[in-house]
Structures are given as C-alpha cells and as structure tokens.
Design a protein with these regions (language model features):
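Conserved catalytic core of the tyrosine transesterase superfamily
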Residues: 1-186
Length: 186
C-alpha cells in the first residue's frame, strides 16, 4: 500500500475540483474546505453553519474548533477564496446545520469514510493515485510551503512536533530525495 501523497500539480487540483463539482456542491465544498484550511477530515466533516456564520447571518472571519485528534482549540482565518465560496454555499442553510450533511438521516454529518469515498472516486476518475482523506491536508501543506517557504510556520499550522515531520508529511523530503537521486552520477 502506497503512502497518501499531496496533489502537487495545480492543474490536477483544479481538475479534481471540477470533477467534484459534477457530483454536487457538497462534495466540492468538502474538498475545497479541507484544501484551503489544512484541517483534518475528522474536523472538516463536523463543521456546522455556526462555525462559519454569526447568528445574524454574516460570515465569520475566523473558524474556531476543538480538534478531534488533539483536543486542542484551533482558531484560524478563512482565506478569501474559502470565505466567498462558503458564503455562497451556506446561503440557504440554517444555524446548527452540518455543512456536509449525510444524505441518510436528518442533519447528520457525512462520515470520514464517506469523505474518503467521495475524494477517492473523483480522484480515480481523473487518474490520480495515492489519494486518501489526508490528501486535502497534505496538499494544503505542500502548497503553503511552496508559497511561503516557511517550515516553522507550517509546522505550527499543522500542529507538528518538528520541522522534519512536517517536511515528510507534505512530501517535500521525498521530492528532494528523488531529485538528488536523479541528479546523482559517479
């Protein structure tokens, strides 16, 4: 079994987003939210309208959650793109509704297993491999690192214990190893 990888190619990321849109706005927004927040899928699926909107219906500029894995409080701003998309997505939703509702039952979130199936199926349709629920978070990390080149900042965002764990997690160490092998010759 191969290790889940970030999606490094921006064109493939766009292609995957388009594929998810074909399935429905919920599936697209699930991926888009994970991709642009760096949250673990277990936290993404449990978001509800109250997490992103104030009681008067205006959008919050920050999300505050208690991470399911670490039990730590995490507060972070919504990037502009996510803010715009989330405002459109939640326009007709009520406070207390889960953002990514299961189609089974009343106001239940989709499971992490269902999130995996959604992402995996769309990824396979466009020819991506080594995809899993961590793909969103790893892709966030990879592209954040490519934009800002600040491993300490990314380590803090992802709540990792060391820079090397962060670099391994986002696949940058493996990229560097691969490049060194390709360019090595005695």
């Amino acid at each position: 079994m191969n290790k889940v990888q970030p999606i490094r190619d921006l064109e493939k990321l766009e292609e995957l987003k388009e594929e998810l849109k074909k399935k429905g706005t919920r599936d697209y927004m699930l991926f888009y939210t994970g991709l642009n927040s760096g949250m673990r899928v277990s936290d993404v699926v449990n978001l509800n309208v109250n997490d992103v909107k104030n009681t008067n219906g205006t959008m919050k500029s920050y999300i505050t959650i208690v991470e399911k894995k670490t039990k730590k409080v995490k507060r972070f701003p919504l990037c502009n793109g996510l803010l715009v998309e989330m405002e459109k997505y939640t326009k007709n939703m009520n406070n207390g509704e889960y953002l990514f509702k299961s189609r089974k039952g009343t106001n239940k979130p989709i499971t992490t297993v269902q999130a995996y199936r959604i992402i995996k199926k769309a990824s396979e349709k466009i020819g991506l491999k080594d995809i899993g629920t961590h793909t969103m978070r790893k892709s966030f990390g990879y592209h954040h690192y490519q934009q800002f080149k600040d491993v300490a900042l990314l380590q803090a965002i992802l709540n990792h214990s060391s820079p090397s764990i962060t670099m391994d997690y986002i696949g940058v160490n493996q990229d560097n190893i691969d490049i060194s092998y390709r360019n090595f010759n005695i």
